[in-house]
Amino acid sequence: MPRSRINGNFIDKTFSIVANILLRIIPTTVGEKEAFTYYRDGMSAQSEGNYAEALQNYYEAMRLEIDPYDRSYILYNIGLIHTSNGEHTKALEYYFRALERNPFLPQAFNNMAVICHYRGEQAVRQGDSEIAEAWFNQAAEYWKQAIALTPGNYIQAQNWLKITGRFE
C-alpha cells in the first residue's frame, strides 16, 4: 500500500494531499512523478523513524530522479538517516554528494560541522589534542560556509566560532 494511504499524522496527511494535487496539475513526466512519490514516501517513513523503509524509498527515488537539485535533497535525507544511525562517515559522504549537486544547502554544511565537532570532542576525550584541533578546524570551516549562506542562522555555531577564535 502506498505510504500516502497509511499516514496517521495530520501534517503527513496534509503534505500527501498537497503533493498529490501538485503532481496532478504540474506538467511532469511519469518518471518524475514516480521519483517524487518515492521521495515523499521516504520522507514520511523517515519522520516515523522507519529508516530502512525510508532508505529503500530514497534509493528508488535516486534511481528515477534526473534533476541534480532534486537529487541533492534525496542525498541530504539519506545523510540524515546515516547521521541518526551514528554512521558518520557514510553521512559525510552523502552530504558531500548533496553539496556537489546543490552548493546552497546550509543544513548539509551544518550537519557536516556537527559531525566534525563531535569527532573533535571524541579526540579530546581520548587525549589526542592534535587530532581534536584538526576536527574542530574542519567543523569551523563547514560552519562558516553554512553561516555565509544563511547569516541569521546557526547562532550557537557563530558563538562557538567567536569563543574559540575561529570567527573571521
Swiss-Prot record:
Keywords: Chloroplast, Membrane, Photosynthesis, Plastid, Repeat, Thylakoid, TPR repeat. It is found in: Plastid, Chloroplast thylakoid membrane. GO terms for cellular component: chloroplast thylakoid membrane. Gene3D superfamilies: Tetratricopeptide repeat domain. One of its GO terms (biological process) is photosynthesis. The keyword Membrane applies. The keyword Cytoplasm does not apply. TPR repeats lie at residues 35-68, 72-105, 120-153. It is a peripheral membrane protein. Essential for the assembly of the photosystem I (PSI) complex. May act as a chaperone-like factor to guide the assembly of the PSI subunits. Belongs to the Ycf3 family. HAMAP family: Ycf3. This is Photosystem I assembly protein Ycf3. It comes from Citrus sinensis (Sweet orange).
